[in-house]
């Protein structure tokens, strides 16, 4: 607003007033300047990520938690040697762990790129195509709704009122005979 002019209640012309505390970019007030410097600014695109809890919204709780016991089980009476069972457990667990790491190393970034593009396109289409189409449809359907309402009130309401009056005088007596 620098250079702007305004008129007070008596009609005097003034330039735009300068705030004593400055603005958010250049605060004149020392306390305000220190407060601005102390605040941490977080950007949604460069925020810190949690490297320990990588599923904070629990998206994969019941889908991907597959352990050895969930896949391989020996019923009572048909057991392999204990050493084979332990080696199978270790092989399964280590293979699953390292093969997942290998796949995520090879395909993690390309898949993140593909899914990022997909959700960007989906968001774009929703914002620029779907919502405007729905709003347009709702505006256009109001006209049809009014015509339909007039039709119902003109033709159907009198018909149903007449049928209702016809059947309103019907009386039913029920007697219980012993």
Swiss-Prot record:
Topology Cytoplasmic: residue spans: 2-104, 126-178
Modification N-acetylserine occurs at: 2
Pfam families with a match to the protein in the record: Caveolin (PF01146)
Region feature (Interaction with CAVIN3): 82-94
InterPro entries registered for this protein in UniProt: Caveolin, Caveolin_CS
UniProt key word Cell membrane: yes
Positions of crosslink type Glycyl lysine isopeptide (Lys-Gly) (interchain with G-Cter in ubiquitin): 5, 26, 30, 39, 47, 57
Post-translational modification: Phosphorylated at Tyr-14 by ABL1 in response to oxidative stress. Ubiquitinated. Undergo monoubiquitination and multi- and/or polyubiquitination. Monoubiquitination of N-terminal lysines promotes integration in a ternary complex with UBXN6 and VCP which promotes oligomeric CAV1 targeting to lysosomes for degradation. Ubiquitinated by ZNRF1; leading to degradation and modulation of the TLR4-mediated immune response.
Chain spans, region Required for homooligomerization: 2-94
Lipid-binding residues (covalent, S-palmitoyl cysteine): 133, 143, 156
The protein's name in its UniProt record: Caveolin-1
Species this protein is from: Dasypus novemcinctus (Nine-banded armadillo)
Organism phylogeny: Eukaryota, Metazoa, Chordata, Craniata, Vertebrata
């Amino acid at each position: 607003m620098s250079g702007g002019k305004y008129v007070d209640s008596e009609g005097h012309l003034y330039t735009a007033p300068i705030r004593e505390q400055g603005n958010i970019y250049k605060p004149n007030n020392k306390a305000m300047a220190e407060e601005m410097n102390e605040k941490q600014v977080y950007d949604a695109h460069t925020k810190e990520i949690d490297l320990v809890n990588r599923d904070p919204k629990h998206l994969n709780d019941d889908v991907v938690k597959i352990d050895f016991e969930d896949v391989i089980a020996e019923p009572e009476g048909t057991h392999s040697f204990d050493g084979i069972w332990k080696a199978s457990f270790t092989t399964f667990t280590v293979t699953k762990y390292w093969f997942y790491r290998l796949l995520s190393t090879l395909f993690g970034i390309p898949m993140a790129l593909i899914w990022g593009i997909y959700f960007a396109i989906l968001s774009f289409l929703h914002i620029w195509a779907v919502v405007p189409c729905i709003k347009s449809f709702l505006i256009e359907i109001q006209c049809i709704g009014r015509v339909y309402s007039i039709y119902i009130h003109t033709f159907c309401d009198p018909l149903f009122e007449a049928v209702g009056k016809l059947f309103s005088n019907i009386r039913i007596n029920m007697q219980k005979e012993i």
